[in-house]
Amino acid sequence: MCKFCPNPSRRHVIAGIGTLSLGAALVGPSRLAMAASLKKPSFTPDEALSKLKAGNAKYLSSSEECEKDLAKHRKEEESSQAPWATILTCSDSRVVPELIFGGLNLGEIFVCRNAGNIADDDMLGTIEYGAEHLGSSLVVVMGHQHCGAVTAACNAVQKGEQPGGFIGKLVGAITPAAEVMMGKDGDFVANTVLENARRNAETTLTASEVVKDLVTVGELKVIYAT
């Protein structure tokens, strides 16, 4: 087994997946026409999701995928890229989407990251670019176990431990999810991780006109997972 590969038993199984939907009435006809003219994805949303699920199962059974020689693929992808999925995930250094989804090659997924996988303006712009210009047909907002940003938000709600500086602003974006999960059955942090992923998937779906349009015409799906 590759010594650089994370132990798959630690977390990297996709434990829960949720899908969000959008009514066509929310999007005007001019926007729908624009969406129809955008770059077509190489996979349908459901095909992309199935590919990620299969890759995750492959990773859990054979993490040696990280031994792949990426030099060849790096050369192949120098001039262009065509990712079929966009992943919004946490900056945690233990979370490596390319490995979690089966040792994917360069150019297959478009990854955007910040602490706590928050769909802020920068991340929404990145998601739009992946969907509109690169042809990504699936957006996954992915939380993870033992997330430090989510734990900090839970501590802020439960213990009043509010960090300062820009970290405080980041934690503040996750606090509403922690407030909703406070007192629920199960692990407080784990519940908040899932709720935070759900909320940011919902933000992605409702705040971005580009995402709305592509979802409405069936060329994009938005899901959340942990």
Feature locations, PLM:
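N-terminal secretory signal peptides
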Residues: 1-8
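N-terminal export leaders
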Residues: 9-24
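Divalent-metal-activated hydrolytic enzyme cores
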Residues: 14-18, 37-80, 107, 116-125, ...
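C-terminal segment of classical bacterial N-terminal signal peptides
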Residues: 24-31
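Boundary at the C-terminal end of the N-terminal hydrophobic targeting segment
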Residues: 33-35
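Glycine-rich, flexible N-terminal cofactor/catalytic loop recognition
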Residues: 72-85, 90-95, 105
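Short beta-strand segments
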Residues: 88-90, 113, 140-144, 223-226
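Active-site cofactor/substrate anionic-group-binding motifs, chiefly glycine-
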Residues: 91-104, 108-122
